[in-house]
Amino acid sequence: MGYPQDLLSSRSIIKHGKYALIAPEGLVKNVVPGFEESDVSILSSPKLGASFVDYIITMHKGGKNTGFAGQADVQSFLYVIDGKLKATADNEEYELEQGGYIYCPAGTKLAFENLVDGDSKVFLYKQKYTPLEGVAKPKIVTGNTNDIPEEDYDGMTNMRLQDLLPTDDLAFDMNFHILTFDPAGSHPFIETHVQEHGAYLLSGEGLYNLDNEWIPVKKDDYIFMGPYVQQACYAVGREKLSYIYSKDCNRDPEL
């Protein structure tokens, strides 16, 4: 990167346990065992206050991971932002192109490798699984967001939702969704809830309310939202704003 061309500054904001905005220009590369020919940045972890770990990964030619997660109590999720991957789980192979994803339940190791001569860009997640008495753990789920219809959000046609995992299966203690806003679209109200989110902006620009602070956000930004932090979004500019995010669900909080 070389010598700076101006005063050092950053758009990133870190409020441990509450929220964080992490801009891409401040990311550093982390050495994570298991990754080859890949640039890995850890976006969130319990050190930030999250109950999960999110990564953004650029996989170069020959890039791969031969065994991500897979511990008895750790589930994982992978989403292809750009490029093409081969993913392997439980001895089954899956080709994932842009918009492709795979969920692996606790105890299932995930292997993946870049299939293109250039770079593939991947959003990766892991979290401990909370079992539910009398309910079997989830199965592997794979799909592509390009095949999932967008549903109007709360009756509004300028805000739409895609569910990447089943919403009617109590085996899942988390889900992934994509929200898309037309320019000038917004949430219907400022939300306050127990769930936490890790969100990666796929396109567009907006203003995000985090703990009652309106913060500019744009494509390739990452947002962590902790429990009970006020949150809502306005889309601005001429392009649709879209982001993928995780959400815990289907469990009663423990005392």
Which residues fall in each region the model found?
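Structured core of small recognition/catalytic domains
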Residues: L164-L255
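Surface-exposed beta-loop interaction hotspot
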Residues: E113-L170
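Ligand-binding loop in jelly-roll beta-barrel domains
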Residues: E92-E93, A106-L132, P227-P253
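Transition-metal
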Residues: M1-S38, A50, D54
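A short glycine-rich, His/Asp/Glu-containing loop-to-beta-strand
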Residues: V28-F68, E151-I190, E196
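Short, conserved beta-strand element in jelly-roll/cupin
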Residues: I56-H60, G70-A87, I178-D182, T192-Y208
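Short histidine-centered beta-strand/loop micro-motifs
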Residues: N65-A72, E113-L115, H187-H193, Y234-V236
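Short acidic-glycine-tyrosine-enriched beta hairpin
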Residues: F77, D90-A106, D211-Y228
